[in-house]
Amino acid sequence: MRIYKLGVIGKPIGHSLSPKIHNLFAQQTGIKIDYQPYQVSPDALDIFIRDFFNNGGDGLNITLPHKIACIESADDKSALVKKIGAANILIHNKDSNKIIADSTDGNGFVEDLHCKAIKLAQTNVLILGGGGAAQSIIPAIQNEKPANIFIDNRSPGKIQPVIERYLSSGDNNDGPFSSLSDLKSFSGTSHIKQGM
């Protein structure tokens, strides 16, 4: 039986539950995997990714701080990655010998909300942060038809380009984007309790 060489890269990485989750999933499905965590600094990212796949790697999960920078190491990008400018998975296509960047964050995020019976339709949504993880969930949130999407970041100057990207994408029919300075109109939302 084939053993798939997989891993998760980030910095730091010791806190990641990905190895445990993926190994349990592999046991449940009868797939053999070698899934390892790799702490990779930003300056070594491209070299690590190329070496991993050149030495038989099948796929990598990507976490902070590499979700944006990792796409530079990909030979091809999904339409979603081209739109959002971030990825959370790199897959080696053995037939074409190409590294493919994709993102499953948004669909996974929304599916988790659905499992908890949380609906986003016609609600106000607040996103804190404007990095790769935040940007990767915006299209999936838009598909849920919220009334408004509010977004803010510790560095306010980084938010405007994110807002403009999604407003200019031509498919934002799901309510306007606003910055946190407009929060006075952020009312009528469901509150998610800590510990859920």
What are these regions (language model features)?
Residues M1-R2, D95, A121-Q122, K145, ...:
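Residue-level preference for short coil/turn positions at secondary-structure junctions
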Residues R2-K116:
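Phosphate/diphosphate ligand-binding glycine-rich loop within oxidoreductases
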Residues K5, D34, N124, A147-F150:
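Residues at the starts of beta-strands that form the adenosine-phosphate
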Residues G10, S103-G106, L113, I118-P146, ...:
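Glycine-rich adenosine-cofactor-binding loop
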Residues H22, C70, I137, I141, ...:
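Hydrophobic packing residues within well-ordered alpha-helices of enzyme cores
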Residues K32-Q36, K98, N148, P176-S178, ...:
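Conserved beta-strand segments of alpha/beta enzyme cores
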Residues E144-S169:
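NAD(P)-binding Rossmann-fold cofactor-contacting core
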Residues S169-M196:
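Short acidic low-complexity segments
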